[in-house]
């Protein structure tokens, strides 16, 4: 089910206008949390992934940093698209580390 199937969740100006473009454009902010990083974060036309100051999408390294990959982490691919998929589909490493610590405490 998509938002278009639930009219009460739509803004009045979009109700009944199923023929419209549904993607969202937006810019990230330096002082606010990031949008969820998806596999298409390198394209500004697929979400709120425009760089905060520059007129471009995020780089692979910027997306990886938002997802908490270490700065020295190397994605072993020559394809920007595959690297973006790896980053967008990943559980953020810092989240996984913290969750693992909690699970360890509970199981001990």
Residue ranges and their predicted role:
Residues 1-108:
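C-terminal target-recognition/interaction regions appended to catalytic cores
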């Amino acid at each position: 089910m998509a938002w278009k199937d639930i009219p009460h969740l739509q803004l009045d100006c979009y109700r009944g206008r199923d023929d419209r473009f549904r993607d969202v454009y937006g810019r990230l902010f330096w002082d606010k949390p990031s949008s969820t990083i998806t596999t298409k974060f390198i394209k500004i036309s697929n979400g709120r992934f425009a760089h905060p100051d520059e007129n471009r999408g995020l780089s692979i390294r910027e997306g990886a940093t938002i997802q908490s990959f270490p700065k020295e982490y190397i994605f072993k691919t020559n394809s920007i698209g595959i690297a973006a998929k790896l980053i967008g589909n990943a559980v953020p490493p810092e989240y996984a580390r913290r969750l693992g610590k909690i699970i360890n405490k509970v199981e001990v």
